Amino acid sequence: VDIPYKELKNGERNHVRTWYKETVRPLLTAQIIDPSHPFPHLKNKTLYAAALLREGDKRRLGIVGVPDVVPPIVMLPGRPGAFVRTEDVLLHHLRKLFKIYQVEEQAVISVTRNADLSYDEAMDQEDLDLRAQMAKLLRQRERLAPVRLEMQGEAPALRELLLQRLKLTPEQSYV
């Protein structure tokens, strides 16, 4: 049973908070996007927490990647089958990652990249190592253009900014 973070009981909240501090927080790196820090490459189908940040009269975009080693859910003790989603926990703690900024909007996002590669065109006829060729093909796919933005949460200004940065249309985003 998926339990929203807001509905956790005190003991469960303490369990999740400890798990976050000990397991997840040390793995996170918050990135502030500005003229000296360009928009990062977002991996295909990887979860990110994104935030629209304000410092005085300046707005910035903040992004935190969720490493693959972080489990997607946290089981809750004392409630068999009950869990909270990792992205829900991350959004709850996001303000602490961007301490000097005011978080105006936040959402969990995922980008889907184009996967349209031609096997025949990508194969080097001189290199017959199929595994190496497939690995090369998969690395190329990671760098292809985004075709979809998925967002969990209502954040219209953040959505607009992300669509602009990813060069996507509103029809290519799903909330």
Language-model features and meaning:
Residues 1-175:
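N-terminal non-catalytic structural scaffold regions of very large proteins
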